[in-house]
Structure formats: structure tokens, C-alpha cells
Amino acid sequence: MSVNPHQFPRPGEVFLDHAGIFVDEFERSGSMLERLGFTMTPFRAHSSALRPGDPLTPLGTGNRCAMLREGFIEVLGPTADTPMAAQLRASLARYPGLHLIAFSGTDPEARHAALAAAGLDPAPISRIERTQATSDGDQEIRASIV
């Protein structure tokens, strides 16, 4: 899959990146989306490094994604007993479905500070790393989550 160059924001821009749907059953949810015509990625367990260069540790969550021309719909669920999975399960206990809207920007520290200055209480910035198979070979993906 080629990357749309307009999918990445320029400095100062913020884009809608993806929506996240929380589910209990990846296969059932993924199969349903495939029947609706979406191209789904294989299941991927999430892992993260506490600091850049640290070893990756499992987060206890995973996903499948319905890929769109620009962005994607992320189908997330718990896979183990971890703090991140407990947070996801608490959201699922309220209701399964849309719980996450993710935006792309270029300066996570500035965005975090702006959210706090606006009176919100953002969680600490999380950093994720993973290897993603692409048509050009494996690529390291790094992201910050505000």
C-alpha cells in the first residue's frame, strides 16, 4: 500500500488520523467489516518502549485496521491483563463501539501543553514503536500519543 503524502500534517497542522472502535472479539468484528467491503489488516498485538531504544514490552491490547484511502478505522481490544488492557476493558464495560478519535500533528509536546492550558487533563505522552510490513519491506513506525 502506498502512503498518501497528504496524510501527514505539515508543521502547525492537525489532521484527523483515525477512529478507534473498542471490541471484545477481533475476528468477529474484522470479519463483519470485511463482509462490508473493508480491507482489514491482520491482527497485531501492541507493544511499546518506555523510552526510545528500550526493548518493546506488550501493552495487553491489539488491533485490526480497516484501511481507507486516507486514514483507517482501528478495531481495538484487550489481549492480556495489563494497565492499558484494564483501561480498555473499563471503556468496553460502558459500551462497545467508538471510543477513540485520533489526530495527527507534528509537535506532541506543544499539543499536550495546549490541551493542559485549555483546562483539560491530558494523560502523559505515550510513545509507541513497532515494525510494519509494507510493499517496500519492513519499516519502523514510531508515534507519540497525547
Task: Please report, for each region that a protein language model flagged, where it lies by residue.
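Vicinal oxygen chelate
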Residues: 2-4, 8, 15-25, 59-69, 87-115, ...
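Short amphipathic alpha-helical segments, especially helix-boundary/capping motifs
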Residues: 3-7, 85-90
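Generic signal for short, ordered secondary-structure residues
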Residues: 5, 11-12, 94
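Extended intrinsically disordered, low-complexity coil regions enriched in Ser, Thr, Gly, Ala
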Residues: 27-46, 81, 93, 107-126
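Conserved short beta-strand elements that form part of the metal-binding/catalytic scaffold
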Residues: 39-89, 138-146
